[in-house]
């Protein structure tokens, strides 16, 4: 289970919070004195603590944003995120298994989360992107985005399904929690989000604006898990044509090409090679190893190559940013000086922001290269005595 815990905890890494202290809160040790296992355990433990100690108190879910100074100009400290909470749930699950908290403490937290989700706003079974954590009422993500968000729901569901599998054969309280999660899973009406039985899934539906957001989802991007879960639903499963016609665009998703001299097989929406969260989010719950279909001969190798493209671009560093290199690479969605941006390996979308989550969460694809970045960032943290390298991308 340790291997699985490492996979979940590092791949769902949103930030390496508190990495400049050891587990007892004392001064940290230089990374050169730590084994790889010890350094990774430090990162895992502090990642767990972000979601465990930093959770919104009522819901137990992950806050949409974290401000170090505690000042929230938009008065949104209590806003929680559905997709990010799916990642956090998996990090907590790994922490339970590794003994960071007791199994009983972990179960109590999961019960709090599920109790909130059972009562929180849903729209044909799908959750919104944001809620107010104290009330469970939807917090609009945008003017017309005040209803169901099927992509964020999928990210949340893969976390909940991991919890379901963890507890399904446990004691009576654990089995009861698994049964409640099973009902939440069965309540999601994936078919509704076909907007009239079209062979494609739509990102949003609003009780006020209906389908006005008008966002049918095609691959490839971060949304593959949504199509997989929609097809797998035991109650509202979509036909195979939705995957083939919608996600795969009748085969147009296949587009062999090279970027940075590295072969890619898929068509990436709007770019030659997407940000690294496209290689990560869908594969928190879906193992890419051995995964293939008629459009991609190996999803693991495709995502590994997408990661290597990102690294190669950062090393080439065509915009000559200070600090980019073999020990400091990784472009993905995160904050920048101009707000949120989906940083990608091309000159238009490269704003000079290295997000720690990008390379560290790629450790399942590039273990040696990701460890180089982990040690580099850890030592920077010691040098400047900042609380941690951190990123919020959801």
Question: What is the predicted role of each segment?
Answer:
Residues 1-8:
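Bacterial N-terminal signal peptides that target proteins for export
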Residues 18-19:
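C-terminal motif of bacterial Sec signal peptides marking the signal peptidase cleavage site
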Residues 28-386, 390-394:
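Ser/Thr/Asn(+Pro)-rich, low-complexity disordered segments
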